Amino acid sequence: MFIKNDHAGDRKRLEDWRIKGYDPLTPPDLLQHEFPISAKGEENIIKARDSVCDILNGKDDRLVIVIGPCSLHDPKAAYDYADRLAKISEKLSKDLLIIMRAYLEKPRTTVGWKGLINDPDMNNSFQINKGLRISREMFIKLVEKLPIAGEMLDTISPQFLSDCFSLGAIGARTTESQLHRELASGLSFPIGFKNGTDGGLQVAIDAMRAAAHEHYFLSVTKPGVTAIVGTEGNKDTFLILRGGKNGTNFDKESVQNTKKQLEKAGLTDDSQKRIMIDCSHGNSNKDFKNQPKVAKCIYDQLTEGENSLCGVMIESNINEGRQDIPKEGGREGLKYGCSVTDACIGWESTEQVLELLAEGVRNRRKALKK
């Protein structure tokens, strides 16, 4: 029910004259009550959270793999992808902790489709309550198959969905944001900060240090009431190398430089793994076909015994490439299992990359024993 603002456009008003109106938001606890997580899903979530923490702290020598579509727009295709991923996850479970990338919102440099929550019908109708409902219903089904990861783009939607995540990420555009650092300090799962869009590491290092401390800030409670939130701090953080305007940073030299800077900041030591490499974005030069090449470089580093790497991030889908959303008709006419945001590698390539990285982990074990 959209409540129109009759004073929109009236410049003599002190506030809200640029606001068209309001649509009441479903309270988080109501949506969570309507779509509760099953016992199996809860077990999967907590087990994966604990495993990620063990990997970050050197107690588990596997590699975390955050892999999946750039963004989810079709629940049916998401279930299909999850079923496929769950099978290979079980096969490679001794070497890889596979977590499905389940991003719902798309940060934009300018404009464009912002994601399933913001515009679920993909027709600029912005039915956000519907988007939250579809997303939560999808998530509680996904977590019964395997753990999922999400990107924290704002400070309100996590109240609806964060109980489903085993891992989270803060993107390059928001790593420098104080709000997102405060949010990360109170999240119940490990969180990764990406380097800046220019490729600089300092913003991510500063974010990790800030998130480790307690904070007090304004937020929204489960019943939907605004409140002052106090957090304990989150030390389960890591840095995601995603490349930038100044070039890639997945190579051996870049990893060693990152390791030194993290050690200098007191954020890691010889027993910890705090670096994840994003095979997409700046590291792929925005060409999805380069992702396997980045994975091969990671494989080579693992084979040499590189022990600072905690994980890898890959954009993958059932079908490779990407597609535009039709200007008319919304999601009608879209190709099944193909991204509508960033281009992804297809399933065949996905399996090959995962097998390669699993072999890399086995090689790392051998190298470190010598």
From Swiss-Prot:
Statement: the UniProt record of this protein carries the keyword Oxidoreductase:
no
Induction or repression? By amino acid starvation.
Q: Name one Pfam family in it.
A: DAHP_synth_1
Q: Note whether Transmembrane helix occurs among the keywords.
A: no
SUPFAM superfamilies, per database record: Aldolase
The reactions it catalyses are: D-erythrose 4-phosphate + phosphoenolpyruvate + H2O = 7-phospho-2-dehydro-3-deoxy-D-arabino-heptonate + phosphate
EC number(s) reported in the record: 2.5.1.54
Can you cite an annotated GO cellular component?
Answer: nucleus
Q: Main role?
A: Stereospecific condensation of phosphoenolpyruvate (PEP) and D-erythrose-4-phosphate (E4P) giving rise to 3-deoxy-D-arabino-heptulosonate-7-phosphate (DAHP).
Concerning its family, UniProt says: Belongs to the class-I DAHP synthase family.
Protein name, as recorded: Phospho-2-dehydro-3-deoxyheptonate aldolase, phenylalanine-inhibited
Q: Which organism is it from?
A: Saccharomyces cerevisiae (strain ATCC 204508 / S288c)
